[in-house]
Amino acid sequence: MRGTFYGIGVGPGDPELLTVKAIKAIEAADVLIAPKTEKKDGSVALEIARPYLKKDIEIVYQVFPMVKNFADDSGAWEANKAEILALLNEGKNVAFLTLGDPMFYSTYIYVFRLLEHEDVDIVTIPGVPAFIAIGSRVGRPIVEGNDVFAVIPGTADKDRLEEVMAVAGSAAVMKVYHNSAEIIDLLRRNNMTKEAVLVSRAGL
């Protein structure tokens, strides 16, 4: 009998922000998939979950290429999929750890799409997204009343960024490290700097 595949959001970095359901799934798993990039040793998601790991847990590191287009390196993704399916076919429950929430700008989304047509039981467990944690961290409401809220990837086209930020009452711009100077300039040109907050590694 095949095992169950769990996608677990470990939140923004503080192990105490994991949900009770996430902790129970981690404790019950036979195997943990710890995603990492080619350029870095170890897995940030794994380190966040480490306080809840049982001693005999099997840990499998998988490298996920940081590419804009999934098709650019589909071979690596297919290899990871095959490894996960092999573990599930052994009857093992496999938990895939991911930062923040599994269904929000997450590597897990691609893994989920690869497995959802493979007759696999999939359980996705939500986590706290970084921008939600930031509101509490800096003591600023993210959105209130009838405000319109937008989430924008920092990699979006500059004109698109400006267009969305002009109509949103509040916005979270994610992953700004590639073009932070352009985004700060945009905020200045639109007189938004007084209300803006720049946060790095919010939960770490």
Residue ranges and their predicted role:
Residues M1-R2, K24-A25, L88-N89, F96, ...:
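Solvent-exposed alpha-helices and their adjacent loops that cap or buttress functional pockets
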Residues F5, M165-L204:
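A contiguous loop/helix-start segment that scaffolds small-molecule binding in enzyme catalytic cores
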Residues M103-V167:
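Class I SAM-dependent methyltransferase SAM-binding "motif I" and its flanking Rossmann-like core
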Residues G7-G9, L97-L99, I152-P153, V173-K175, ...:
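Short beta-strand segments
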Residues A34, Y61, F96-T98, T124-G127, ...:
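General beta-strand structural signal in soluble alpha/beta enzymes
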Residues P65-F70, D157-D159, L204:
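A short acidic, often aromatic-flanked loop/helix-cap motif at beta-alpha or helix-coil junctions
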Residues M1-P15, V20-A22, E27-D121:
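Class I S-adenosyl-L-methionine
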Residues K39-G42, V67, P129-I132, S180, ...:
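Short gly/pro/ser/thr-enriched loop/turn and capping motifs at secondary-structure boundaries
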